[in-house]
């Protein structure tokens, strides 16, 4: 791709978004997908896989803070964390901020993503790959959760959309495997798309997760790069109380963790579980 051109996201057939490409840093087909990293004056460095924006320097903090701090602070004493995907390292960066976490395992199907992101998205990982608690496993996520002998307190599925290599991370086989290696009282979260435009994705995840967990729901955040409205995150656990903790408990855990965030705070934590009525209605109709 030439510089000073427009890059078109191809996630949706009938509409989409464009980014001006100021400088192409990397563009190559890895073993699994087409990967491009380019610079844009408004959003900084942008990474896309198979024509779909995955992350940008400008707003990645919203996504990654909400995917990590919500489940980790709701759990309260997570020691072992599993990240599925997350090759750009930003999810890992946020998990390493929790000093009570003892082990962090990241399973990424594409070694190329990790290598390229270490070089071209250094602000995302911020040196977190060198954290002594971290272990990288190059494997398919479904295979890992169904074969591992490890167990985890929090599982974060930083999956792409349910197309290409990421499709398997929206299957019953994956959710069943996550339940298998999740400790009692543990929490599973996953990105579930922009519910206004990808409602079927959320409904499908809710239906499948409900076979394995007694408390299944969603929380949300507005992330500019993910076009079309609020992004939903799937939430699944067998401890229904964790979704309804008092603001005092979350506030105390937040301060004890010593976190200083750019988006997440205890008030956002509580508000994130308030969902639009159209999603409630769609879930009730299933």
Swiss-Prot record:
Signal sequence, renumbered to the chain: none
EC numbers on record: 2.5.1.16
Record protein name field: Polyamine aminopropyltransferase
Reaction catalysed by this enzyme: S-adenosyl 3-(methylsulfanyl)propylamine + putrescine = S-methyl-5'-thioadenosine + spermidine + H(+)
Active site residues of this protein: 158 (proton acceptor)
Pathway linked to the protein: Amine and polyamine biosynthesis; spermidine biosynthesis; spermidine from putrescine: step 1/1
Xref: SUPFAM superfamilies: S-adenosyl-L-methionine-dependent methyltransferases
Quaternary structure and partners: Homodimer or homotetramer.
Predominant place of localization: cytoplasm
Family statement drawn from the similarity comment of this UniProt entry: Belongs to the spermidine/spermine synthase family.
InterPro entries documented for this protein: PABS, PABS_CS, SAM-dependent_MTases_sf, Spermi_synthase, Spermidine_synt_N, Spermidine_synt_N_sf
GO terms of molecular function: spermidine synthase activity
GO cellular component: cytosol
Matches recorded under PROSITE patterns: PABS_1 (PS01330), PABS_2 (PS51006)
Gene source species: Salmonella newport (strain SL254)
Annotated function: Catalyzes the irreversible transfer of a propylamine group from the amino donor S-adenosylmethioninamine (decarboxy-AdoMet) to putrescine (1,4-diaminobutane) to yield spermidine.
Subcellular location: Cytoplasm
Top EC class, one word: transferase
Gene name of the record: speE
GO biological process, one term: spermidine biosynthetic process
Binding site for S-methyl-5'-thioadenosine: 33, 108, 140-141, 165
Domain PABS positions: 5-238
Species lineage: Bacteria, Pseudomonadati, Pseudomonadota, Gammaproteobacteria, Enterobacterales
Residues holding spermidine: 64, 88, 158-161
PANTHER family: SPERMIDINE SYNTHASE, SPERMIDINE/SPERMINE SYNTHASE
Keywords attached to this entry: Cytoplasm, Polyamine biosynthesis, Spermidine biosynthesis, Transferase
């Amino acid at each position: 791709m030439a510089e000073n051109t427009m890059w078109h996201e191809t996630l949706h057939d009938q509409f989409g978004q464009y980014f001006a490409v100021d400088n192409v840093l990397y563009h190559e087909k890895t073993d699994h997908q087409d990967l491009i990293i380019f610079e844009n004056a408004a959003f900084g460095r942008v990474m896309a896989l198979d024509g779909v924006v995955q992350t940008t320097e400008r707003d990645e903090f919203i996504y990654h803070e909400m995917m990590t701090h919500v489940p980790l602070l709701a759990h309260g004493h997570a020691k072992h964390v599993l990240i599925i995907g997350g090759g750009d390292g930003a999810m890992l960066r946020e998990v390493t901020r929790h000093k009570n976490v003892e082990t962090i395992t990241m399973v990424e199907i594409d070694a190329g993503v990790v290598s390229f992101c270490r070089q071209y998205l250094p602000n995302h990982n911020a040196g977190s790959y060198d954290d002594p608690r971290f272990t990288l496993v190059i494997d398919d996520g479904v295979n890992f959760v169904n074969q591992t002998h490890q167990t985890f307190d929090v599982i974060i599925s930083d999956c792409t959309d349910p197309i290409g290599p990421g499709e398997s991370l929206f299957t019953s086989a994956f959710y069943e495997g996550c339940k298998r290696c999740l400790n009692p009282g543990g929490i599973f979260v996953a990105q579930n798309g922009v519910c206004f435009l990808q409602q079927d994705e959320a409904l499908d995840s809710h239906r499948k997760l409900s076979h394995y967990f007694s408390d299944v729901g969603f929380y949300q955040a507005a992330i500019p790069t993910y076009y079309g409205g609020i992004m939903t995150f799937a939430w699944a656990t067998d401890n229904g109380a964790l979704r309804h903790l008092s603001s005092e408990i979350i506030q105390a855990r937040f301060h004890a963790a010593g976190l200083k965030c750019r988006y997440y705070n205890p008030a956002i934590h509580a508000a994130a579980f308030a969902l639009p009525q159209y999603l409630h209605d769609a879930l009730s109709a299933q």
